[in-house]
Curated annotation (Swiss-Prot):
SUPFAM superfamilies with a match to the protein in the record: Sigma3 and sigma4 domains of RNA polymerase sigma factors
Sequence similarity: Belongs to the UPF0251 family.
Tree of life domain: Bacteria
UniProt organism field: Vibrio parahaemolyticus serotype O3:K6 (strain RIMD 2210633)
UniProt cross-references to PANTHER family, sorted A to Z: PTHR37478, UPF0251 PROTEIN TK0562
Coiled-coil region: none
Stated name of the protein: UPF0251 protein VPA0321
Length: 96
């Protein structure tokens, strides 16, 4: 049986639904979904400049979990930028 996922504290949401390369129709692009907790981890680490421990405390998760989350988010952003994919920000009601 899988361990239950600890609820993360998330203070905001993305300003837009997605970011994509200019001039390419959305339906022609591969989509890379970044989860709300991944976006929050990026915000805390890269925008706010918090240490991993400070950011983990603010999200209510362990430092190790925070590190894994921000690593996953950075990979998805880099993949989208380098390979020209659409980066989408699904909300809790989405099925992505």
């Amino acid at each position: 049986m899988a361990r239950p996922k600890i609820e993360r504290r998330i203070c905001g949401r993305a300003a837009h639904h997605c970011f994509k390369p200019n001039g390419v129709p959305f339906h022609q692009l591969e989509q890379v979904a970044i989860l709300p907790e991944e976006l929050e981890a990026l915000r805390l680490a890269d925008l706010e400049g918090l240490s991993q421990q400070q950011a983990a405390d603010q999200m209510g998760i362990s430092r190790q979990t925070f590190g894994n989350t921000v690593k996953s988010a950075r990979f998805k952003v880099a993949k989208s930028l380098v390979e020209g994919h659409a980066l989408v920000f699904p909300n809790e009601e989405s099925n992505l």
